[in-house]
A protein has these predicted regions:
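Structural detector for internal amphipathic alpha-helices that build alpha-solenoid repeat scaffolds
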Residues: 6, 13-28, 36, 44-58, ...
Length: 187
């Protein structure tokens, strides 16, 4: 394991990427070492640890959630992407908070992970729509549109009257995906 972790943190992206299948093949025995590496001082080492955790079918969502609060935006983004591979409703609250991340990639990937989780994400996403900044509302509405849950219909209908063309677009997309593809507009 030590040799594989050395490859993973070698600073050479090709060597690091090539070490991941062997690390994953170790199964559950690799997870504790990767979680320890995810707390390393070096952001690049943390990123590669998250990358390897994302590839492992033995990684639990609960192990990835704390990494959404990492000090490095690239590690937060990797954690959100990892949660796309390991979606679980236990991550909904943390991912909902990550929609507000200053890093646009992290916020967008958090929205994608919420879509992968599906229906359990809807109450949090509806709450976000109540007063979040416009950029965050766009991410939330895009997620609601992709989840296709009827609980989002009132919010989508309300958004059709908003000034934002992007919000209107995602509301129309969501309504269309729900089979409500009529033209909605003010008379």
């Amino acid at each position: 394991m030590h040799a594989l972790l050395a490859e993973l943190t070698s600073g050479d992206d090709v060597r690091a990427e090539n070490s991941i299948p062997a690390i994953v093949e170790l199964g559950m025995t690799a997870i504790p070492a990767l979680l320890e590496l995810a707390r390393a001082e070096d952001a690049d080492s943390r990123w590669w640890a998250v990358r390897a955790l994302a590839a492992s079918p033995h990684t639990r969502s609960e192990e990835l959630i704390p990494l959404l609060s990492d000090s490095a935006p690239e590690v937060r983004a990797a954690a959100a992407l990892a949660l796309c591979n390991h979606p679980h409703e236990s991550a909904v609250d943390a991912l909902s908070q990550s929609l507000f991340d200053a890093d646009a990639l992290t916020a967008g990937l958090a929205g994608t992970a919420l879509v992968k989780i599906g229906s359990p994400s809807v109450p949090n996403l509806l709450e976000v729509m109540k007063g979040a900044p416009m950029g965050v509302q766009i991410l939330a509405l895009r997620a609601l549109s992709d989840i296709r849950d009827h609980r989002a219909i009132p919010v989508m209908m309300k958004v059709l009257n908003e000034e934002s063309a992007v919000l209107q677009y995602w509301a129309q997309e969501g309504l269309q995906k729900l089979g409500l593809d009529m033209i909605y507009g003010k008379p």
